[in-house]
């Protein structure tokens, strides 16, 4: 279904989520209106001409106890003025992104494809078994989100008399429910739903696939409320939101911009915390599909609209530094420095800023001269890859301006076109915890290049904030200065009313603040999603084994005999309660280790590294890691605090290998 060809296009020069009121800006206003006009022009009408005067911005009603985020909105408006002046010299060659307005049902169809559920509609509906297996691993709220969108697509296809086999959505979800209600065999990993498997108990021995559900979720007694600052990664965020609604008829009051940000923490998980970059690509793909479904379910539960947005392909330069898609830029860089994950120019600009001391007052806030920035851009384009550019000539504030310009001139936003609206909508979630949960899922959904670059940016911004006593750049200041550079792109946007413009300013600054403050938490993959990935892997393995048995039915006897021999050999090699750890690149390539309650991944690494000699002795902690490979996971890098016995019970068929992380 190609809806792009049949829809009318809208050319956007800046991006705004839902504002429809159009107010023309005035670039020639004098006196008291001048600052207001230029600020408005800077954000929403960068490429517009022929503007008219608008009323002066209404005063902002500020409370007496403003927190750091709202110290001075003037920093935000000043940054927009600086952006406007910078763009006046860099209009040439810019092309607006064309965003097509989708037909009814098209967004839902794209969503199902992104979620890996295209088998639920269209020509492949005749064999939906794979999707039904996927659905059987979903939580109640996730399944509801999927069903809602399948129904919309089915209704739309019927209306349009498409020549597809339109299966009744009730049939699909009836099969899904049957799959969930079937008694699990010993190799099944139980669902992580909060309303399932209560009171079930098994012995302490691990099954062939996983441990029983009480090992999957550490339940908090109903009469013991969880700490408001604890982030529960073991239960679906959407399910938590439902439980919160049921627990209290009155939802937590909507947060205001002057609420201080709490110090959230992640309780220790004995099976180890999983971070982005720890999983194999095939498992990470499943994580992204589940994160999209979970994010949508969370927005559905909280009554917010979740819509992805696609941009039509536009012409972009295929070489250079500024205005180049991240993927193309990284391809260029990797020819120079193999394994590069963050653009070299971006890294160099950050390095140049830090060389001038992060204690410089007004760092990031004070702009470089617009004409000088333009000349530096041209010189960088010509000399950067040749290695002849003179970095000593770049002043610190100029480097900061170039860094922000790089972000603004990306053909598509660093936060991605698909999810920019969802990032902006985070400000509308009722509680800080739910805002954090949504941001966590959104970060997971970003393309690798965008996510890696965002991480480098946030880490740099935190280093700037760490020097706030000297540079006067608090977290609130930095958030307000950087928000328009991330949430406003020179190719996106709509003119809006002043009230809407002000709400967007405060809201995006708030989201920027959350990204900086909670960046360490945001790069964590929730445990309930990892558990669902394990469950999917088990279901897929069962399906593959079933297919294999049909193909090799005549060889069943020989295979069973061989498996028994292998099992006997393995049992003799590794006694009960012992794991064998492989280290193919170290001098001691294998070691049998007795499992104890206290044994952690860091202890296993320490035992191997302590026995290294010669050249291998130079290996340090952080250069090699212990991996869980196979069983019900593809591959997972373990954090130091992983309790090995607990993880062994969760995945008894895994292999344990010490190796370095892939570049």
From Swiss-Prot:
Residues carrying Phosphothreonine: 156
GO molecular function: GTPase activator activity
Tissue expression from the record: Widely expressed: expressed in most organs, except small intestine.
UniProt region (Disordered), positions on chain: 14-73, 85-106, 173-228, 245-277
Listed GO CC annotations: cytoplasmic microtubule; cytosol; nuclear speck; plasma membrane; ruffle
Keywords on record: Cytoplasm, GTPase activation, Phosphoprotein
Entry-linked CDD domains: RhoGAP_ARHGAP18
Key word Endoplasmic reticulum present: no
InterPro entries: Rho_GTPase_activation_prot (IPR008936), RhoGAP_dom (IPR000198)
Biased composition (Basic and acidic residues): 27-37, 85-102, 178-205, 212-222
Ranges annotated as biased composition (Polar residues): 38-51
Annotated site location: Arginine finger: 365
Residue numbers carrying Phosphoserine: 65, 68, 260, 263, 610
Domain Rho-GAP: from-to ranges: 324-523
Localization annotation: Cytoplasm
A Gene Ontology biological process term: small GTPase-mediated signal transduction
SMART domains per UniProt: RhoGAP
Subunit structure and binding partners: Interacts with MPHOSPH6.
General function of this protein: Rho GTPase activating protein that suppresses F-actin polymerization by inhibiting Rho. Rho GTPase activating proteins act by converting Rho-type GTPases to an inactive GDP-bound state. Plays a key role in tissue tension and 3D tissue shape by regulating cortical actomyosin network formation. Acts downstream of YAP1 and inhibits actin polymerization, which in turn reduces nuclear localization of YAP1. Regulates cell shape, spreading, and migration.
Protein name as catalogued: Rho GTPase-activating protein 18
């Amino acid at each position: 279904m190609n809806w792009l060809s049949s829809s009318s296009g809208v050319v956007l020069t800046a991006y705004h989520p839902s504002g429809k009121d159009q107010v023309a800006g005035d670039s020639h206003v004098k006196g008291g209106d001048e600052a207001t006009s230029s600020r408005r022009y800077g954000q929403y009408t960068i490429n517009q001409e022929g503007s008219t005067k608008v009323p002066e911005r209404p005063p902002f009603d500020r409370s007496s106890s403003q927190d750091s985020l709202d110290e001075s909105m003037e920093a935000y408006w000043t940054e927009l003025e600086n952006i406007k002046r910078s763009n006046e010299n860099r209009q040439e060659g810019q092309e607006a992104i064309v965003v097509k307005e989708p037909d009814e049902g098209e967004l839902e169809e794209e969503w199902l494809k992104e979620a890996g559920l295209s088998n639920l509609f269209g020509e492949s509906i005749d064999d939906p078994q794979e999707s039904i297996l996927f659905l059987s691993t979903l939580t109640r709220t996730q399944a509801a989100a999927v069903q809602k969108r399948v129904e919309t697509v089915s209704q739309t296809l019927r209306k349009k008399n498409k020549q597809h086999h339109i299966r009744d959505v009730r049939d699909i979800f009836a099969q899904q429910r049957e799959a969930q209600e079937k008694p699990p065999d010993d190799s099944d990993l139980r669902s992580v739903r909060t309303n399932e498997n209560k009171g079930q108990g098994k012995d302490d021995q691990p099954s062939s696939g996983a441990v029983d559900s009480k090992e999957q979720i550490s339940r908090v007694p109903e009469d013991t409320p969880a700490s408001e600052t604890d982030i529960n990664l073991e239960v679906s965020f959407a399910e938590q939101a439902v439980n919160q609604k049921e627990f209290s008829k009155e939802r937590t009051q909507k947060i205001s911009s002057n609420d201080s940000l709490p110090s959230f923490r992640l309780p220790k998980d004995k099976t180890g915390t999983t971070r982005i970059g720890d999983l194999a690509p095939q498992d990470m793909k499943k994580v992204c599909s589940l994160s999209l479904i979970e994010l949508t379910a969370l927005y559905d539960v909280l009554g917010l609209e979740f819509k992805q947005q696609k941009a039509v392909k536009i012409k972009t330069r295929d070489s250079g530094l500024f205005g180049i898609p991240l993927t193309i830029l990284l391809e260029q860089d990797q020819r120079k420095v193999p394994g590069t994950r963050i653009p070299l120019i971006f890294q160099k600009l950050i390095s140049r800023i830090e060389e001038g001391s992060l204690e410089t007052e007004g760092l990031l806030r004070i702009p470089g001269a617009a004409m000088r920035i333009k000349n530096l851009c041209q010189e960088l384009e010509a000399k950067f890859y040749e290695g002849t550019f003179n970095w000593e000539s770049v002043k610190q504030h100029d480097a900061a301006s170039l860094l922000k310009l790089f972000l603004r001139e990306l053909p598509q936003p660093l936060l991605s076109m698909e999810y920019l609206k969802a990032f902006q909508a985070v400000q509308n979630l009722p509680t800080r915890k739910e805002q954090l949960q949504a941001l966590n899922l959104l970060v997971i959904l970003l393309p690798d290049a965008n996510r890696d670059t965002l991480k480098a940016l946030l880490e740099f911004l935190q280093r700037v904030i760490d020097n706030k006593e000297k540079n006067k750049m608090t977290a609130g200041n930095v958030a307000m200065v950087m928000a328009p550079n991330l949430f406003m792109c020179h190719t996106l946007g709509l003119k809006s009313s002043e009230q809407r413009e002000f709400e967007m300013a405060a809201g995006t600054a708030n989201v920027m603040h959350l990204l900086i403050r909670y960046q360490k938490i945001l790069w964590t993959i929730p445990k309930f999603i990892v558990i669902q990935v394990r469950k999917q892997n088990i279901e897929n393995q069962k399906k593959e084994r079933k297919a294999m048995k049909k193909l090799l039915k005549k060889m069943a006897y020989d295979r069973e005999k061989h498996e028994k021999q292998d099992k006997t050999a393995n049992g003799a090699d590794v006694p009960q309660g012992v794991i064998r750890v492989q280290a193919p690149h170290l001098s001691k390539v294998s070691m049998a280790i007795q499992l104890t309650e206290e044994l952690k991944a860091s202890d296993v690494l320490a035992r191997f590294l302590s026995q290294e000699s010669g050249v291998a002795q130079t290996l340090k902690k952080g250069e090699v890691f212990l991996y869980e490979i196979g069983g019900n996971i593809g591959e997972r890098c373990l954090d130091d605090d992983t309790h090995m016995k607990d993880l062994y019970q969760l995945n008894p068929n895994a292999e344990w290998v010490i190796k370095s992380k892939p570049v």
